[in-house]
Amino acid sequence: MKSVGLEEMMEAGVHFGHQTRGWNPKMSSYIYGNRNGIHLIDLVQTARLLSEACDFLFNAAKEGKEFLFVGTKSQASDIIASEALRAESHYVNQRWLGGMLTNWSTIKTRIRKLKDLEQKEKNGILDTLPKKEAAVLKRQLYKLRKYLSGLQDMKYLPDVVIIVDQKREINAVKECIKLGIPTISLVDTNCDPTLADLPIPANDDAIRSINLLVSKLADAIYEGQRVK
């Protein structure tokens, strides 16, 4: 696996944290200074921890483990979906519904409903129903597809969860902790790195930063899956 260079990370703005007044003191060991009231992340540590996370994912993928990518903010949404699909993994990129993992049996029922409605749509059955009934089912289909399409092929709880924006996805983080599912999280200067099994200190707001790091994590999974 090709490692990420410090210059490449700087160009992507990985080192830019949040305003100093909004920091989490638990991130102090990953911060090397500040500029104009913005904390700057130590990219040497980012590179090291990204490499550790990639090694972990590569080995897990080699063993046939399942992965879930989570990132619902607008800057991350498209990246999460495309990189998860490339890594033959699952994703949540619109909204974390409470109990997505801790109440998996209920979510599985909703996924079955989604598949059933998609089949009915494909076969043209929805168009043969009375107008009101068809409208209700089409609304259901739209909503289920929006929130659950990235989980359609997930038969069991994931073995590893990759998270962009720990603060925003705190409910996902808590569910993983409760179930003992390891997490890899991009942690900005306002996050708590102790909540992640493998934290990666990084700018979790800039599209280029998110894209660079998530694509590297997906690369590790992709390569691990192809080891004979």
Swiss-Prot record:
One of its GO terms (biological process) is translation. GO terms for cellular component: chloroplast; mitochondrial small ribosomal subunit. Pfam families: Ribosomal_S2. The keyword Plastid applies. GO terms for molecular function: structural constituent of ribosome. CDD domains: RPS2. Keywords: Chloroplast, Plastid, Ribonucleoprotein, Ribosomal protein. Belongs to the universal ribosomal protein uS2 family. HAMAP family: Ribosomal_uS2_B. NCBIfam families: rpsB_bact. This is Small ribosomal subunit protein uS2c. It comes from Mesostigma viride (Green alga). The gene is rps2.
